[in-house]
A protein has these predicted regions:
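Intrinsically disordered, low-complexity Ser/Thr/Pro/Gly-rich regulatory segments
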Residues: 1-373
Length: 373
């Protein structure tokens, strides 16, 4: 058995670690803090997750220290945490200063309950809830739940309980990613179009532009198509469907924007976007497709074919933007490096593995790939 206490400074230390982790997890999962989930705002749910994770991290660390000092302590027996639900909710409410009813509502959302058993039958991806409701006023706190992003499990549960929640979660993502994109091009050098702009052909909408940035220094104009899809599951059919749709959508968007510009000209495009005080010089146009989590889909058998489009995932785009810095022609350089990576083909070599079980040898052919240098 394991028992310990902690000072306020120690609690604050693990709370700081948990806050840093949860903010990154929240962004990766695409859970905006301003949406409404059930009875509460998601920011309150996120806050409760921070405090639960801090308790998990503290327990893991203290169990590790105890095992080093007292070898007789059994880690597998000490790590699982059983607790009365009412006491845990009260503890977090006191620790956080939140209303106890608010904490209870957050627990109703993030806990895996006995009534969710059907969900486990159909779910094939990693699922590690922060809290397990045993159905008898007791809960289990599996500290292993911090090994992966817990919001993936929470979002999967939410969608199982209410399929309409997917729209609620997805609706703020475009604005969210647009604002993050514009933060990379701040200052007086750039003009940033604040909202989604539709390109019309007569009375019909041909396509739309999710984001646009104009470089006042060089006359370069960059148009962006923004995508934020979830890929935290292993259903191959769903993954291939998302990959196919992403590649098709980006190709169609590039084709329609190019078609509109060829028919109407760059001057009308800049007026449509509301860009002002354009320098008296030739304007260059660059098209970018940014997907928050994944962009190149050749691994699923699909690829984008548009020659005038550079695609990337969000971390890749940030990396190149930071590497390029205040270059003379920022968008030209960005477009070039992204196109080079987009067209780059890796030389892969299949790898096999052998596992010895008793007197038998199991050989898995082509289980992994290695990258040839």
């Amino acid at each position: 058995m394991l028992s310990y206490g902690a000072t306020l400074e120690v609690d604050d230390h693990f709370l700081a670690l948990a806050t840093e982790l949860v903010i990154r997890w929240r962004d990766d999962a695409g859970l905006h803090p301003d949406i409404k989930i059930g009875k509460i705002n998601s920011k309150d749910l996120i806050k409760v997750v921070v405090y639960i994770v801090s308790l998990h991290l503290k327990h893991i660390r203290f169990a590790s220290l105890a095992a080093e000092r007292y070898p007789e302590i059994m880690i597998p027996q000490s790590l699982p945490l059983w607790e009365r639900l009412e006491i845990l909710i009260q503890s977090i409410a006191e620790f956080s200063g939140m209303n106890q009813k608010l904490v209870s509502d957050a627990f109703d959302i993030l806990m895996l309950r006995p009534s969710d058993s059907e969900f486990l039958k159909m779910h094939t991806s990693k699922f590690m809830p922060l809290i397990l409701d045993m159905g008898n006023a007791w809960v289990l706190r599996p500290v292993s739940s911090v090994n992966i992003n817990p919001f993936f499990s929470i979002l999967s549960l939410l969608e199982y309980r209410n399929t309409n929640v997917r729209h609620t979660i997805s609706s703020p993502r475009e604005d969210w990613l647009r604002n993050d994109l514009y933060a990379l091009f701040w200052g007086t050098r750039y003009q940033r179009v604040k909202k989604n702009i539709r390109l019309r052909e007569g009375n019909s909408v041909l396509t739309d532009i999710d984001a646009a940035i104009y470089d006042n220094l060089t006359g370069e104009l960059a148009l962006f198509q923004i995508k934020w899809q979830d890929y935290f599951f292993n259903d191959v059919k769903k993954l291939r469907s998302k990959a196919s749709n992403l590649s098709k959508d980006l190709d169609e968007w590039s084709e329609r924007v190019t078609q509109w510009v060829e028919a109407n000209g760059l001057s009308k495009l800049t007026r449509t976007l509301g860009i002002k005080d354009i320098p008296e010089k030739t304007t260059s146009l660059y098209l970018f497709g940014i997907s928050r989590n994944a962009a190149r889909m050749q691994g699923y058998g699909f690829r984008t074919h548009a020659e005038h489009l550079a695609i990337s995932n969000w971390p890749q785009f940030i990396r190149h933007r930071c590497n390029i810095g205040p270059a003379p022609c920022v968008f030209q350089t960005l477009f070039g490096v992204l196109r080079n990576e987009q067209d780059h083909q890796l030389a892969l070599k299949p790898m096999s593995i052998e596992i010895v079980v008793s007197s038998k040898i199991m050989r898995y052919e082509d289980l992994w790939n290695s990258i040839e240098s």
